[in-house]
Amino acid sequence: MTDSHATGDMPRVTIYTDGACRGNPGPGGWGAVLRYGQHEKTLKGGEAVTTNNRMELMAAIQALRTLTRACDVALWTDSEYLRKGITEWIHGWVKRGWKTAAKQPVKNAELWRELLAETQRHRIEWHWVKGHSGHEGNELADTLANAATDEIQAAKRQAMAGEQ
């Protein structure tokens, strides 16, 4: 997944991510849109019992994991938790052995570790966009996240119907 419009020798990729959850915890999904040149790739997935923050993290992890080589990435999210977590808070968490400033264990630490590992391969600019504000890339990621959530809920209903 690369783009001929590169910064230096790194391909330039734009990523939009979003997470969704019905109930918190509850069934949830994540969606990602990756754009490079004239190409677009969409990704989605979900879990039967999760949280909105876990789905926001999964969207970014899976999108970055999809890139086959080091890239110059502009990643857009409507989650301040994700953006601030990876750009501001994570450095302190690592220094404190994955504890918060209040000495509590960091929530979703295993996902933050995965995200941190994925970021090491790329040069990433993290951007925040207001959710549900008509931003086309974010809206598409939101649609994918909700579609994944719908699929999780449908599979659960089907499994429950089969048990009767």
UniProtKB/Swiss-Prot annotation:
InterPro entries on file: RNase_H, RNaseH-like_sf, RNaseH_domain, RNaseH_sf, RNaseHI
Q: Please list the residue ranges annotated as the RNase H type-1 domain.
A: 9-150
Asked if the Swiss-Prot or TrEMBL record annotates the protein with the keyword Kinase, the reply is no
The Swiss-Prot or TrEMBL record lists the needed cofactor(s) as: Mg(2+)
Q: Which GO terms describe its cellular component?
A: cytoplasm
Q: Any signal peptide, and if so, which residues?
A: none
* Its job: Endonuclease that specifically degrades the RNA of RNA-DNA hybrids.
**How does it associate, per the subunit comment?**
Monomer.
Q: Can you tell me which family this protein belongs to?
A: Belongs to the RNase H family.
PANTHER family in UniProt? RIBONUCLEASE H1
> Which positions bind Mg(2+) 2?
18, 142
Q: Which GO MF terms are attached to this record? A: magnesium ion binding; nucleic acid binding; RNA-DNA hybrid ribonuclease activity
Q: Which UniProt keywords apply?
A: Cytoplasm, Endonuclease, Hydrolase, Magnesium, Metal-binding, Nuclease
One of this protein's GO BP terms? DNA replication, removal of RNA primer
Its domain of life reads Bacteria
Q: Which reaction does it catalyse?
A: Endonucleolytic cleavage to 5'-phosphomonoester
Q: Where in the cell is it found?
A: Cytoplasm
Q: Which organism is it from?
A: Chromohalobacter salexigens (strain ATCC BAA-138 / DSM 3043 / CIP 106854 / NCIMB 13768 / 1H11)
Residues the entry annotates as binding Mg(2+) 1: 18, 56, 78
Q: Cofactor note from UniProt?
A: Binds 1 Mg(2+) ion per subunit. May bind a second metal ion at a regulatory site, or after substrate binding.
The protein here is known as Ribonuclease H
